[in-house]
Structure formats: structure tokens, C-alpha cells
């Protein structure tokens, strides 16, 4: 016999022989194959998907509501901006109006000063009309009951009688309102 006819030793090591075969434990219970019911699997999957669908639908509805709320807030803010668009300009013009009123308070002695005062009065009247056209009005103060949202008490004086308590007795600087907002409170003297 030639060498090729006999199997190599390494080939023999891999062969399974009766003495090398895995031994079965006679006491071990036979393996039971667990067969799952396919209907139960589908029912579980349907229940999981239904719950997930409800969760996603809830998230969608919440997102939709949030978008609607954002749109409503945006519309409200925009309406506020449009409503009060002249507010900053009015605040800038008020000191100029105060200066014109101070100029008119000075007594004019000669004819040239009186003519100048007339021009200042016309300018002030024009500004006041423009302010009223935009919804800016003077806050009524003298003789009114003190209101901290409209008046700023700069000084207090003793009341002459009980009727005048908490009443504005003198206006030091006019206050103005723009629609329903106070642009500048009136600086007043209040009786206590």
C-alpha cells in the first residue's frame, strides 16, 4: 500500500467515532419545542402599534394646538405693535411741547415778542392737534382725585378742608395718554 491509500492522522482526529460522540444524558428530559401562537403575536403587535399610534396622534394634536397658540400670540403682538406704533415718536415730541408751553408762559412786553409768541402758539396748537389725531391726549389732573397710574405726586400740601383730600391742587408738568396707555404721568401737587 502506498501512503496515499491510508488516511492521514490529522484526518482521523476530526472523525467522529462512537466513543467520541456526545453522550446523551438518559435522565435529561426531552426538549419541548415551544410553539408560539401566531395569532397571539399579531394581537400583541396590533396592541403595541395601536398604543404607539395613539401616542403619535396625541403628540400631533398637541403640536397643532401649539402652532395655533403661536399664531394667535403673533397676531396679538402684531396688533399691539400697530395699535401703539406712534408711542415712541410721541414720547420724543413731549419735551418739545413742554418747551413751547414754557416759552408761552413768559410775559411778552413789546410787539415783536408778541408776534413771536403768536408763532409759538400756532406751532404748539399744530402739535397738539397732530397728537390728538394720533390718539394722544392730555391727562386731566387739576381738581381730580389723585390716581397713581395717571399722576406722579411730586409734593403734598395740607388740605384746607376734608373735601380736598387726595385731590390734585396743582399741575407742575402735563401728563399724556396714548389710547389706553399712560405715556407720561402728570407731575402734580396733592392735598393731604
Curated annotation (Swiss-Prot):
Subcellular location: Cytoplasm
Main location: cytoplasm
Region annotated Disordered, chain positions: 1-41
Keywords assigned by UniProt, alphabetized: Chaperone, Cytoplasm, Stress response
GO molecular function: adenyl-nucleotide exchange factor activity; protein homodimerization activity; protein-folding chaperone binding; unfolded protein binding
UniProt cross-references to Gene3D superfamilies, sorted A to Z: 3.90.20.20, Head domain of nucleotide exchange factor GrpE
GO-annotated cellular components: cytoplasm
Superkingdom of origin organism: Bacteria
Glycoprotein is among the record's keywords: no
HAMAP family referenced in this protein's UniProt entry, alphabetically: GrpE (MF_01151)
Described purpose of this protein according to its UniProt entry: Participates actively in the response to hyperosmotic and heat shock by preventing the aggregation of stress-denatured proteins, in association with DnaK and GrpE. It is the nucleotide exchange factor for DnaK and may function as a thermosensor. Unfolded proteins bind initially to DnaJ; upon interaction with the DnaJ-bound protein, DnaK hydrolyzes its bound ATP, resulting in the formation of a stable complex. GrpE releases ADP from DnaK; ATP binding to DnaK triggers the release of the substrate protein, thus completing the reaction cycle.
Family: Belongs to the GrpE family.
Record note on quaternary structure: Homodimer.
Name of the protein: Protein GrpE
Amino acid at each position: 500500500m502506498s501512503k496515499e491509500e491510508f488516511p492521514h492522522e490529522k484526518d482521523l482526529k476530526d472523525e467522529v467515532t462512537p466513543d467520541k460522540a456526545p453522550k446523551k444524558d438518559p435522565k435529561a428530559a426531552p426538549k419541548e419545542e415551544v410553539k408560539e401562537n401566531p395569532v397571539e403575536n399579531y394581537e400583541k403587535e396590533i396592541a403595541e402599534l395601536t398604543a404607539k399610534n395613539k401616542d403619535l396622534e396625541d403628540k400631533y394634536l398637541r403640536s397643532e394646538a401649539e402652532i395655533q397658540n403661536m399664531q394667535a400670540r403673533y397676531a396679538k403682538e402684531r396688533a399691539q405693535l400697530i395699535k401703539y406704533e406712534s408711542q415712541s415718536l410721541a414720547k420724543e415730541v413731549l419735551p418739545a411741547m413742554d418747551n413751547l408751553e414754557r416759552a408761552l408762559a413768559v410775559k411778552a412786553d413789546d410787539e415783536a415778542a408778541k408776534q413771536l409768541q403768536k408763532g409759538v402758539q400756532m406751532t404748539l396748537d399744530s402739535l397738539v392737534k397732530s397728537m390728538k389725531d394720533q390718539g394722544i391726549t392730555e391727562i386731566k389732573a387739576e381738581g381730580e382725585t389723585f390716581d397713581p397710574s395717571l399722576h406722579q405726586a411730586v409734593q403734598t400740601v395740607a388740605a384746607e378742608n376734608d373735601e380736598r383730600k387726595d385731590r390734585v391742587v396743582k399741575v407742575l408738568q402735563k401728563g399724556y395718554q396714548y389710547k389706553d396707555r399712560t405715556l407720561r404721568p402728570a407731575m402734580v401737587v396733592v392735598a393731604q
